[in-house]
Amino acid sequence: IIGARVAGISAVQASGQPGADNASLSIRGQSGIIYVIDGIRRSASDFNGLDPNEIESVSVLKDASAVAVYGLDANGAFIVTTKKGQTDKVTISYTGTVGISQNAEEQEWLDGPEYAYWYNKARLLQGDTEVFTVDMVRKMREGVDGWGNTNWYDKVYGTGVRQHHNISASGGSEKIRFFTSIGYLEEKGNIDKFKYRRMNLRSNIDAQLAKGLSLSLGVSGRIEKRDAPKFSADPDDWMNIPQQVCYALPYVQDTYEYNGKIYDVSTPTSGSPVAPIASIYDSGYNRSNQSYMQSNFSLKYDTPWLKGLSLKFQGAYDLVHGMTKQLTKPNEVMIMDLPNAATTTLTYHKDYSVLKDTPILSESASRAQEFTTQTSITYDNKFGDHSIGVLLLAETRERNSNNLGVTGTGLDFIQLDELNQITGFTKEGKEQPAIPSGSSSQTRVAGFVGRLNYNYADKYYLEASLRHDGSYLFGGMNKRWVTLPGLSLAWRINNEKWFHATWVDNLKLRAGIGKTATSGIQPFQWRNTMSTSPNSVVIGGASQTAIYPSVLGNPNLTWAQCL
């Protein structure tokens, strides 16, 4: 929606999976967009996770002079303000929508006989013998002797259902105002077994504590749950289900009976065999559960001794917990044997799918917390036709995260899919101990901002800004900090006395220049990377592990700057 309504914004949707269809936004072809929600910088996932009913307004900053004040990696900015309570009686609102989702354009596929016709044509052009005979084509239409006529597209794709509900309450008095919102979103994909659920909660409270002293407190949270088969629908993933639909051959049946049991059919390709139906229902699962809590606190004091002078402190604390669980489930399929010129009856052989014959269970957990502080002084006043605004701000951001996970092989009972049931052995009896993993990280950035706004008679505008940013990504005081200036001039033509076009209510000419900076590197590349090598040296008659610099650091790394 934003991409269609705001000039210079392009949106590219790379996936249609429930809960993963967020568009990638760019401004005038440039990435590096930041998102500021209620004055605090947030991630793209936080922006995408907002309930639309919580949003009061969205502003877009597109040029360098406007975003220079936001510093690190800011080539453009979305400024989001969430709803606040009004001085009025309590109002309760409900909105709800239910819709369906289908592929925008139904693809046309060759059926079995058509595939046979064009395959034979290609063989003849190469000087080879035809493979498919008239009798084979007849059997495809009749579905006998192992032949079939399956439209895998119709078998896999259906109709998804999307529902969204929100209830909110707002109100207040001169002293205190509130806004509270609860939302629920559920999406079921047009491929079965894909499901996304999200619950949003937001509460904003604004209070006048004393004359000139105001308090704002915002608390929000959301829970996101995703369910999918082990094979995803992401176009970048190996053996994704839409890809399997494209590769599956149409002249087979979708199921095959063998020794009194019904199996899903798999067809060979130039790589691994594909079995779209089995990949949806029998490959296992991929589940995730993410919990987000965000708080925003600000205290503002309008000084009585100087009109227009305000002091403000704003802080935010974010906490994220994540859990994922993946089960790779072995499943048997009937793999079709490719026909040749001597084939009369299409044959199949029973084997495990591409996921092999041993179950694999993986679980991981993550935790991240982020602290943001902003201390600012602002001055806004008007002297006749002259308006002036000054901002001085200091900002810090710190993020700490931890991740751990375990992958185990072998389960005696696939229904008991818990890590304490892992056997550590493959079906053939080969030992494969559980593999643990873990990591942690810490990031810190700081910045100082100065900005001057001036306008004369609401016709001529000047804005100048200067930001001094520091990042943990670079070493040494000479490389860690960067200074980012910005300057813009504007002329509101429609406010001139000689402008009489009443049908134009806002005509503005603006020019700006500014410097932005991006990091674009992994942490600690300014230091040497040390690696270990076992059994590299002998000390005291015993082999020892050696430590050596595998990658030399570059102490001269610094910000990539753009004017």
Each predicted region: which residue ranges?
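Short, polar/charged loop or turn motifs at beta-strand boundaries
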Residues: 1-4, 13-16, 22-29, 38-46, ...
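Non-catalytic regulatory/gating segments with a bias toward low-complexity or hydrophobic composition
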Residues: 2, 9, 58-59, 78-80
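Short acidic/polar hinge/loop motifs at secondary-structure boundaries
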Residues: 4-5, 38-68
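Residues embedded in well-ordered regular secondary structure
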Residues: 5-8, 16-23, 33, 76-77, ...
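Short, glycine-/polar-rich solvent-exposed loops and beta-turns at beta-strand/coil boundaries
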Residues: 12-21, 48-53, 70-74, 194-197, ...
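Flexible glycine-/small-residue-rich
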Residues: 13, 27-31, 62, 82-84, ...
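Short, solvent-exposed loop/turn motifs
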Residues: 41-42, 130, 262-264, 387
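Extracellular/periplasmic, surface-exposed regions of secreted and cell-surface proteins
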Residues: 163, 198, 204-213, 218-223, ...
